[in-house]
């Protein structure tokens, strides 16, 4: 096979849809890492905080971050399953 034929074959394997899926997967993975860091920082703040109002606010913020991470993890799992197919 010539190089041009090999390149055409490669393009067929990595179609635009597949590249977009990979980019989305990587992007979500980066966002999840940032959310995890933010959640850990909030946990530390919550441990140090003594004011009840501030603790409730921090806890709400942590709950929101946790929900966002769970949604992101679920989307990541779906993309991973689609990647296998």
Question: Model-found features: residue ranges?
Answer:
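Alpha-helix N-cap/helix-start motif at coil-to-helix transitions, marked by capping-box chemistry
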Residues: 1-4, 29, 33-37
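Short, charge-rich amphipathic alpha-helices with coiled-coil/heptad character
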Residues: 1-21
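Charge-rich, solvent-exposed alpha-helical interaction surfaces
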Residues: 6-9, 27, 61
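Secondary-structure edge/capping motif, primarily at the C-terminal ends of alpha-helices
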Residues: 14-21, 42-50, 79, 83
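Short, charged, amphipathic alpha-helical segments
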Residues: 29-30, 55-64
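Short E/K-rich amphipathic alpha-helical oligomerization segments
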Residues: 33-56
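Amphipathic alpha-helical coiled-coil segments
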Residues: 65-82
